[in-house]
């Protein structure tokens, strides 16, 4: 066990510091904004320092582990720890949350509560990624939902209450299945119940029971990821939420579902995952085509970007279902890659809305001349989203392709069919993304409007855009930076399978 409680401090610090903000004197919104940004930067620096000096990349076991008895009545411990699977998502959470707080500068209504909720969400997300106890994982999972619901219902578009209600119904409903899975898997088998993930990873179950556990967890994570047909909350939520909230949703919250699939479904229930993986492969392939086909029909800019997130999630599902070293590595890389790309696209969509106050693409046009910086960044990041070589998305999708090709689980004809359908999806992706850019930035619609004028990106927005773009290009050029973190853990997970 680690001598110093690094992870406890990293998890508790944001929400504790955010609580202090409620007692700060009322001296305008700027105090709250800069206080929150300072907390996020300090948290990110603390996390980076703790990981740099205490994390060994060649060790697949849990590191920085903490294990404290919490409730004596039953076997409930405050168990924290990280490995190659969680370190990338925790660093991504810190980076995106810091930039999202900077993006939230235009928010003036109830600024104190808004920034407190962002910090509370920060704690819940890091807690989920670093939990080594199933019940603690569930608590952190639920803790993170409350701030998201309030952020959706209080700040956003005209239909924000509808989208927030839809979000909470979907996620709270899926949490019932998560709780059933947690209680079932912890109470089965041994003489006394255990919630320790490390012990549960070595537990074996009757086939029928393992399938039931797998389905319960799969439903919970499929809603959050999202996986079709449980995705319908996502376009509505993204369409109405404030763009800083969208950055957190696309950049981090969706990744929690994918993380759960690997951490629990794949690691704890390998036999059931092996049985379900062909079906997940089919769903992932359909998802890529479905989202890429549906996206061009969306008038709302943020809804169109939301469907691109659904399409990218298809590659993650396929990578997880391939049960191969390249496939799983590609899925993990895609989780990190899309965290940056999704957050960046929603930020640029939000900054565009701040200027023109239009959400429908068919009402836009001709913006490129007046806002060349936003136009340039939007074009570059659209290229990143459609997996242009040299960008992180290209490497991630390419490795997933290798994962399918090298998989021993599927017949050759199945692999050819899957790759063919995925290729069609990759052809459709540039169509809806480039069409989106054309509708926004080309033509003469806004230029012909009387008194048409608005300003381009300021220093804050330019800094934010470049800050997200740099890791996208960096990972695209040198993907080993991310892959080296998880490679040993991936091998450890796949050692439970008979092929790959």
Curated annotation (Swiss-Prot):
UniProt entry keywords in alphabetical sequence: Chloroplast, Membrane, NAD, NADP, Plastid, Plastoquinone, Quinone, Thylakoid, Translocase, Transmembrane, Transmembrane helix
Highest rank taxon of the organism: Eukaryota
Membrane-spanning segments: 4-24, 35-55, 87-107, 113-130, 134-154, 167-187, 211-231, 242-262, 272-292, 305-325, 330-350, 386-406, 416-436, 462-482
Enzyme class name: translocase
Molecular function via GO: NADH dehydrogenase (ubiquinone) activity; ubiquinone binding
Subcellular locations according to the entry: Plastid, Chloroplast thylakoid membrane
GO biological process assignments: ATP synthesis coupled electron transport; electron transport coupled proton transport
GO cellular-component term (any): chloroplast thylakoid membrane
Family named by the database record: Belongs to the complex I subunit 4 family.
NCBIfam families membership: NDH_I_M
Protein name from the UniProt record: NAD(P)H-quinone oxidoreductase chain 4, chloroplastic
Species name: Olimarabidopsis pumila (Dwarf rocket)
UniProt lineage: Eukaryota, Viridiplantae, Streptophyta, Embryophyta, Tracheophyta
């Amino acid at each position: 066990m680690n001598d110093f409680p690094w992870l406890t401090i990293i998890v508790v610090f944001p929400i504790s510091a955010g609580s202090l903000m409620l007692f700060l004197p009322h001296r305008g919104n700027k105090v709250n904004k800069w206080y929150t940004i300072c907390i996020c930067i300090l948290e990110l620096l603390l996390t980076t320092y703790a990981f740099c000096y205490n994390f060994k990349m060649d060790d697949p076991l849990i590191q920085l582990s903490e294990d404290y008895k919490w409730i004596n009545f039953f076997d409930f411990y405050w168990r924290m720890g990280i490995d190659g699977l969680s370190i990338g998502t925790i660093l991504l959470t810190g980076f995106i949350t810091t930039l999202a707080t900077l993006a939230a500068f235009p928010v003036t209504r109830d600024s104190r509560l808004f920034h407190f909720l962002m910090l509370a969400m920060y704690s819940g997300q890091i807690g989920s990624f670093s939990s080594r106890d199933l019940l603690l994982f569930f608590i952190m999972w639920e803790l993170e939902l409350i701030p998201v619901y309030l952020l959706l219902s209080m700040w956003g578009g005209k239909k924000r209450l509808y989208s927030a209600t839809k979000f909470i119904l979907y996620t709270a409903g899926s949490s019932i299945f998560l709780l059933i899975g947690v209680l079932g898997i912890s109470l089965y088998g041994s003489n006394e119940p255990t919630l320790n993930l490390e012990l549960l990873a070595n537990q074996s179950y009757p086939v029928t029971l393992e399938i039931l556990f797998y389905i319960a967890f799969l439903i919970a994570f499929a809603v959050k990821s999202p996986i079709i047909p449980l995705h319908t909350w996502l376009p509505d939520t993204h369409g109405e939420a404030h763009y800083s909230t969208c950055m957190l949703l696309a950049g981090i919250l969706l990744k929690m579902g994918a993380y759960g699939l690997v951490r629990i479904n794949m690691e704890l229930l390998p036999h059931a995952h092996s049985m379900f993986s062909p079906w997940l492969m089919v769903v992932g392939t359909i998802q890529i085509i479905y989202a890429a086909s549906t996206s061009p029909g969306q008038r709302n800019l943020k809804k169109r970007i939301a469907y691109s997130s659904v399409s990218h999630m298809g590659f993650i599902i396929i990578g997880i279902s391939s049960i191969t070293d390249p496939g799983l590595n590609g899925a993990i890389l895609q989780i990190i890659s899309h965290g940056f790309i999704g957050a960046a696209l929603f930020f640029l969509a939000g900054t565009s809305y701040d200027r023109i106050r239009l959400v429908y693409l068919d009402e836009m046009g001709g913006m490129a001349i007046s806002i060349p910086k936003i136009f340039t960044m939007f074009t570059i990041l659209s290229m990143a989203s459609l997996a242009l070589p040299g960008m992180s998305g290209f490497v991630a999708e390419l490795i997933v392709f290798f994962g399918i090709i090298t998989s021993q689980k599927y017949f050759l004809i199945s692999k050819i069919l899957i790759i063919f359908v995925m290729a069609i999806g990759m052809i459709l992706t540039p169509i809806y993304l480039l069409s989106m850019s054309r509708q926004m930035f080309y033509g003469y619609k806004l230029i012909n409007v009387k008194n048409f004028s608005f300003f381009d990106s300021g220093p804050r927005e330019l800094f934010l855009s470049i800050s997200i773009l740099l890791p996208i290009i960096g990972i695209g050029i040198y993907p080993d930076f991310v892959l080296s973190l998880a490679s040993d853990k991936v091998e450890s997970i796949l050692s439970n399978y008979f092929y790959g």
